[in-house]
Amino acid sequence: MFCVSGLILNHPSLFSKIDVSRRWLPSAYRYNNWNNGLLRGTEKWRAQVLLYGNNGVWLTDSTAKHITDFNKGFPQGVDNRNIRGLISMPGNAVFAASTYGLYRLDPQLTWQYVDIGMAENDKISDITTCGDSLIVTSRSYIFLALPPYTSFKTLVVKPAYNEPHRVSLFRTVWWLHSGQLFGLLGRLVVDGVALILLFLSISGVLYWFLPHIRKGAGKRLMPHLFLWHNKVGRLTLGLTILICVTGWLLRPPALLLIVYGKIPPVPFSTVDNDNVWYDKLRSVRYDATLNDWLLYTSDGFYSLRQLTDIPQRTAVQPPVSVMGLNVQQTTQGDFWLLGSFSGLYVWQRSSGIISDYYTFQGPQKTEGSPLGTHIVAGYSPHFIGGKFGVDYNKGALLIPMPREMAILPMSLRQIAIELHTGRLYTFLGSGSVLYIFIIGLGILWCLWTGKKIMKK
């Protein structure tokens, strides 16, 4: 399963149009009360409300009594309608930013793709507006457009003031595990390792099983099987152990060893380039009170007077889960509402005061777990029931969710992620967190003992 799911994850574009109904998945994966990322945010449009999240866009009004599918024009596949943000511009132009592209709503209420000049391996992380300017943030660049929004200028954010170029140790290990650290060639090498591990697994089982079925056939096949199993295993032992160890480090408890680490970029890798913000940008928003831009990255928050200025790290760094921000809105003055899996907080930038949205107390330090009491996946201020945050697990109770939305499809790529990380095995309960740790040790044991047996 690791090998097959890994191959799918290494080539997401090949499988982006393949979905599976949640009907066939464990009940925890079914949507309930807009949970599991179904509702990330809302946007007022004319006299109605547009809801968006990881399964597209939906149309309703401030009462949310009737929910209508509003996804006409998006490419086939849930992966292609994972909406990061939605903006209604002056003049009623509406833009939706999916992970893989920007779309504009035409007069026939159909979403049309807009080419912003984004690289093939880049992903959109946010969309915002400042006056009549449209700003799209990818994970590596900022794209700026003015009316009629047909041409975008690419901005490379300058290196931060007085900060050395460092990259995430976690992301480096992750990309080494997938091969992405060295581009297409690296991914193909890892694909080969996946196929090798698949062969070693199957041949190992057959070597044990065949003699118990038909002794004659088993005896004839076993020498050849044993020979190739040993040859392939010996030649690729270093690579298979590397893939095993790096995967082992990407899940708890080993994850805690690397999750906050920073290292120099690996020479000649994809992160070793002139853009120090490669795969680090998450959002940029204009603060009308302080007259500057608030830049959020995987390294924290920075401020810039102009988008072309040198970013300055803010003196106060609000608590944000390592999974990143899901909510970033201004409320009054220079108050910012920031939501992530660490919780929902209000940050007044001028004073530096941060308070919990629900308890009005200061942020509490949590040891180990990146999850707070409230696992915030979204927020909406547009319904008559009042403003509310959306909990990833519990959802939102203030607006009803149509029953038929519970089994909306999940992309094959996302299922592969859940399978690859062990989260899909919900019958393990809390033990699923340790699944990779235990299985990883088991695989290492098999590789080590196989090497020992081969020497005899």
Where are these regions (language model features)?
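Alpha-helical transmembrane signal-anchor/signal-peptide segments
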Residues: 8-32, 251-275
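Repeated scaffold domains used in trafficking and secretory/extracellular systems
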Residues: 30-43, 76-91, 120-132, 271-286, ...
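Juxtamembrane interface at the cytosolic side of transmembrane helices
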Residues: 1, 184-241, 252, 428-456
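Beta-propeller fold detector
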Residues: 66-74, 112-118, 151-166, 311-320, ...
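Hydrophobic alpha-helical segments
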Residues: 116-206
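Short loop/turn segments that connect beta-strands within beta-propeller blades
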Residues: 61-65, 106-110, 146-150, 305-308, ...
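Loop/turn residues immediately N-terminal
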Residues: 54-58, 64, 93, 99-103, ...
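Extended, hydrophilic extramembrane loops/domains of integral membrane proteins
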Residues: 134-172, 337, 383-417
